[in-house]
């Protein structure tokens, strides 16, 4: 084995992995860092990669691709795993895997590697991308192989002269444009309230402004295109909402999560923009979709989120679901007015040129009402199956 391409975050695990891979396989190690919006010092990451022993380092700016190829379909699918988590990490991993494979092909590498552990979801997500896109390339998972604990990793890094000052952080953080995940420390106790020091994107709700913020989000075909009437690129909308909603304390998630590998974990997230966009659009869908469309879309949305969380981005059913959900979103056009106030978001208005709601028919103040004869006929036909089966079974 002569060349290994490693998905490199710059943290302890992947930095140790560089030196370990060189030592274990006698191979040249090429590191790849993919910029998906994480607030990192990429120059420092590059320097650390070389100090760890990398022969070459790639920094790939994939923010626009992340937004257009991954976040956009997630918005259309109202993607919230277990109804709360907007899949920031799960969406980024297939893209990172794809970029690692591109570099591996360019460099003529024999193998690719990742820094995921055997307890986490990311091992599945990375390897799904590797296997789908380059089944001929060998996959190496150093952390699953070396058997070192955290303390031993530090000692190994010190021995190899790898600078890991950032690893004194209390929590394990994964961040991109769509969400920020926080793990470790006292958060592993489900009874322990997350301390404020764990959060960066959102202010404590009780310290948010005393005055609410009203915001109008315009959607076209299920995708936000404007804020307060000003058209913006999706990446700009996400950035703006992360700041605005976060300033009002909105966007925190704290829940018990069912991992791909069968373990439960306590997960804490910040996702102000994601939750603002998705919860606004879900309300708009109620205005423009009929009852059957709405019910089917809710089912498909949930399945899409489960699929992506479980590492199956490269499954053909995901492509089919994208097509179905896009078709169902053709009429999801209009404006949603939301009120942000001290950690909460309320939809307070919605309008659409495609609205199915008709005040002239629905209002109790309108002159049109179904006749008694029409109502009786509908009720009898609607209830027949239920009434007959209930009486036959339980009123003998």
Curated annotation (Swiss-Prot):
Pathway, per UniProt? Amino-acid biosynthesis; L-arginine biosynthesis; L-arginine from L-ornithine and carbamoyl phosphate: step 2/3
Keyword set includes Iron: no
PROSITE patterns linked: ARGININOSUCCIN_SYN_1 (PS00564), ARGININOSUCCIN_SYN_2 (PS00565)
Which Gene Ontology BP terms does the record give?
A: argininosuccinate metabolic process; L-arginine biosynthetic process; urea cycle
Q: E.C. number, please?
A: 6.3.4.5
Localization of this protein: Cytoplasm
Per UniProt, which keywords does this protein have? Amino-acid biosynthesis, Arginine biosynthesis, ATP-binding, Cytoplasm, Ligase, Nucleotide-binding
What Pfam family is a match, any one? Arginosuc_synth
Q: Any keyword Amino-acid biosynthesis?
A: yes
Q: Which reaction does it catalyse?
A: L-citrulline + L-aspartate + ATP = 2-(N(omega)-L-arginino)succinate + AMP + diphosphate + H(+)
Q: Name one GO molecular function term.
A: argininosuccinate synthase activity
**Residues the record lists as binding L-aspartate:** 117, 121-122
User: What do the Gene Ontology cellular component annotations say?
Assistant: cytoplasm
Binding residue positions for L-citrulline = 85, 121, 125, 172, 181, 257, 269
Q: Which residues bind ATP?
A: 7-15, 115
Q: Which family does it belong to?
A: Belongs to the argininosuccinate synthase family. Type 1 subfamily.
PANTHER family listed in its UniProt record? ARGININOSUCCINATE SYNTHASE
The record's subunit annotation is: Homotetramer.
- Which protein are we looking at? Argininosuccinate synthase
The coding gene here is argG
